[in-house]
Curated annotation (Swiss-Prot):
Pfam families: Pantoate_transf. Its main location: cytoplasm. Catalyzes the reversible reaction in which hydroxymethyl group from 5,10-methylenetetrahydrofolate is transferred onto alpha-ketoisovalerate to form ketopantoate. 3-methyl-2-oxobutanoate binds at D49, S50, D88, K118. Mg(2+) binds at D49, D88, E120. The gene is panB. Disulfide bonds: none annotated. It comes from Pelobacter propionicus (strain DSM 2379 / NBRC 103807 / OttBd1). It is an enzyme of class 2 (transferase). One of its GO terms (molecular function) is magnesium ion binding. This is 3-methyl-2-oxobutanoate hydroxymethyltransferase. Keywords: Cytoplasm, Magnesium, Metal-binding, Pantothenate biosynthesis, Transferase.
Length: 269
């Protein structure tokens, strides 16, 4: 599909909200998965700092570095996806100063090949988003459950219940006013996500935020059943590939040990 459809752009994403067409976003951290995800027809590919957990085996995203994000973004960009390519800005790459944030976001575009960056935070990061968008780098916001703030939040907990709801609505409005072209809503009640989506003119993309967002994002490894250690409530598994892969490796091991592989078919004369 990636060779037949036209390139998705930032204006296309904005137009999708206006036309009430649902936006689809999926993670990819490397070249092979980028090709597969793009062939599936998603509108946006996210090189998420979730790679720290999913790809590298850490307990959270806080150890992911700029160099790691650039490396993975370059790998995904080589797939030349028709989907718009968005990359997470990792922890401490944009919090220190506006100047450093702009420089690092510029690196992600220039060195990584991203077409947009994602920045976590609401009112507290609106000045950073405003500065980055002012130098023509598209920014996707991210509010609610922000994984880079897990220590303050006390872990991966649903946000926006009771008195928190008003603050998260204010965060959403601040991110929009700062110039973001879209915003991820993570781990918030579906009723709050619906209210934010109705209030904003920019698209909302939900993950654990219910069905009323303008779009949805999930981690590719989660939907394929490759992350066996955990399965959040908001994840739907569309395949169970872990046992398929394990079985293939087991059969390879057995055939090598028994002498059944390689055969003449797999040998050179």
């Amino acid at each position: 599909m990636s060779d037949m459809r036209k390139k998705v752009t930032i204006p296309d994403i904005l137009k999708m909200k206006q036309e009430r067409r649902r936006i689809t976003m999926m993670t990819a951290y490397d070249y092979p998965f980028a090709r597969l995800v793009d062939s599936g027809g998603v509108d946006a590919i996210l090189v998420g700092d979730s790679l720290g957990v999913v790809f590298s085996g850490h307990d959270n995203t806080l150890s992911v570095t700029m160099d790691e994000m650039i490396y993975h973004t370059r790998a995904v960009a080589r797939a030349k996806p028709q989907a718009v390519l968005v990359t997470d800005m990792p922890f401490m790459s944009y919090q220190v100063s506006v100047e450093e944030a702009c420089r690092n976001c510029g690196r992600m575009i220039q060195e990584g090949g991203a077409q947009a960056v994602k920045i976590e935070g609401g009112m507290n990061m609106s000045h950073v988003i405003r500065a980055v968008t002012s130098i023509d780098i598209p920014v996707m916001g991210h509010i609610g459950l922000t994984p880079q703030s897990i220590h303050r939040m006390g872990g991966y907990r649903v946000q926006g219940r009771k008195e928190q709801a008003e603050r998260i609505m204010e965060d959403a409005l601040a991110v929009q006013a700062a110039g973001a072209f879209s915003i991820v809503l993570e781990g918030i009640p579906s009723s709050l996500a619906a209210s934010i989506t109705a209030e904003l003119s920019i698209p909302t993309i939900g993950i654990g935020a219910g069905p009323d967002c303008d779009g949805q994002v999930l981690v590719i490894h989660d939907i394929l059943g490759l992350c066996e250690k955990y399965s959040p409530k908001f994840v739907k598994r569309y395949a169970e590939l872990a046992p398929v892969i394990t079985d293939a490796v087991n059969r390879y091991v057995e055939e090598v040990r028994s002498g059944a592989f390689p055969t003449e078919e797999h040998s050179f004369n």
